[in-house]
Amino acid sequence: MEEFQEYFKKDKSPQQHFLYPLLLQEYIYTLAYDDGLNGSIFYEPIEFMGYDNKSSLVLVKRLIIRMYQQNFFIYLVNDSNQNRFRGHTNYFYSHFFYSQMVSEGFSVIVEIPFSLRLVSSPEEKEIPKSQNLRSIHSIFPFLEDKLSHLNNVSXILIPHPIHLEILVQILQCXIQDVPSLHLLRFFLHKSHNMNSFLKNNKTIHVFSKETKRLFWFLYNSYVYECEFLLVFLRKQSCYLRSTSSGAFLERSYFYGKMEHIHIIIVYCNNFHKTLWSIKDPFMQYVRYQGKAILASRGAYLMMNKWRYYLLNFWQYYLNFWSQPYRMHINPLLNYSFYFMGYLSSVLINPSAVKNQMLENSFIIDTGIHKFDTIIPVIPLIGSLSKAKFCTVSGHPISKPVWADLSDFDIIDRFGKICRNLSHYYSGSSKKQSLYRIKYILRLSCARTLARKHKSTARALLQRLGSGLLEEFFMEEEQVLSFIFPKTTLFPLHGSHRERIWSLDIIRVNDLVNQII
C-alpha cells in the first residue's frame, strides 16, 4: 500500500493519474496471487491447468513482455470470440493463464482508489475487526433480539440481472481513468461472452473461476449503490441529531460507520456475501446475498413508503425496472420467511402469571414473542434431489459419479456433507427433521458403496455391521463434549430443542445455498 501511495504522490499536478500502467508492475501480480493485500482467508487458491498454483516470476515477466506489445489486448479480444480449442490445447491453457493473470492483476488495481481512502481515513483504527463477525451465524442472535419486538416485515430481492455498463458507471465516480474503464468493459464483455459459450460446452469448466475476484468487487460496488438510499433516508430522518458518516473500502470489503447504523460483514469462499444490519429503534435491515429483510415497528403505511422509495430509487438511479413483487410486506406474527437456509418466524408463547394482592388472587394471561428458526425439510430434500442423493419424494439413491472412488473417499464425502449440515442447522429449535436428512445421506452412501461392490445396501450393512457410517449420527452435544470436556456441568438433555449458534461458519454448504 505504501508503494501505491508513493505512486500517487510523485506528481502533485491536478492531472489525472492513470491506473493501467500498474499492470506492468511485478508486485501487482504478487499481491494478486498472495491471497490479497492482507492475506485474506476468504480467497480460494486459484488453479491453472498445466501450471503451478502460484505464479512464478518467469511467467509474470513473460506476461509483462507480451503486454508491452501493441496488439496484445486486441489479440485477447479477437481470441475471446473464437474457438481455439481444436488442436491447440497447450496454447489455449497458456493463453487462458495469461488472460486470468491480467484479470486478477486488474482486480487489485481497481481496488487501489478505495483502499487509499481506508489508509488515509482518520477512523481507520476504529474499524471493528472482531473475528466472530465473519460467522454467518452471528446475525441470528441479532434477529432474536430485534425481530421479536417488531410488527411488519418485508422480503426484498435485490434487482438482478444488472446491465454491464451500469457496473462501469458505478465506478466512474472513484475511477476516472478512461483507459482503465475501457479495460474493465473488455473483461466484463469477455466474461459475458464466455459464459454464454459455456452453456453449450459444459466440459470446459475452467472459466467458472475466471475473474471471480473482479466480480466480487463489482458486486459489492453494485450492492453498495442499491443500499445507498437506506443510508441516505436514515440520515435525513435523523437530521435533528448529530451524525457522522464515512464510507470506505478495505480491498473489496465495504465498511460503513454511522451513529445509528451498524454494518456487519460476512464472507463466503464460493461467492462474496455481504450482510448489513441497520440498528434503529424502529427499523431493522438485514441482507444476505441477493435477499434482504426489512422489518419495522411502525405501521403498514411506513413500510409502504420505504417500499416506494426503494423501487423508485432502483428504477431512476440504476436504470433498472424493479417489479413491485420483489418486495412483500406482511405482518411479522403471521408470516414465515426463508432466510439464510432457515425458515424463520415470530411465535407467541402463551404463559399464565398468577398475581396475588392481599387476599385476592387472579391469573394474567400473556404472550411472549419468540423468534423461531426451523429446518426447511422439503426445500432441503429438493436440494438433495438436484444433487442426485435422493428422488424428489426423498427416497435415497446411489451416487453413480462417486462409485469409482475408494471406500474411504466415498464415506468421507458423505460424512463431510452430513457434518456440515448438522453444524449449520445447530441453531434450529426442532432438530428432529434433521434426522430425515441424515437418513437420506446414510442410505445414499450405503447404496453408493453397494453399487461399487455390486451388492445390495442391506447385505452391505449386515456384513459390515451397524457401526458403519456411525459418524453420520454424531450429535452437536457430542461435538461440544469433545471441545469442552471439563466445563460441561450437566449433559445437554433435550438437545433437539437447544439452539447453538456457531461463530466459525464462514461458508454455506452448496445444498443450503440453493434454498437461500
Curated annotation (Swiss-Prot):
Domain of life of the organism encoding this protein: Eukaryota
Segments crossing the lipid bilayer: none
Family affiliation: Belongs to the intron maturase 2 family. MatK subfamily.
Function description: Usually encoded in the trnK tRNA gene intron. Probably assists in splicing its own and other chloroplast group II introns.
Coiled coil feature spans: none
Localization of this protein: Plastid, Chloroplast
Gene Ontology biological process terms from the UniProt entry: mRNA processing; RNA splicing; tRNA processing
GO cellular component, one term: chloroplast
Principal subcellular localisation of the protein: plastid
PANTHER family: MATURASE K
UniProtKB keywords: Chloroplast, mRNA processing, Plastid, RNA-binding, tRNA processing
GO MF terms held by the record: RNA binding
Name listed for the protein in its UniProt record: Maturase K
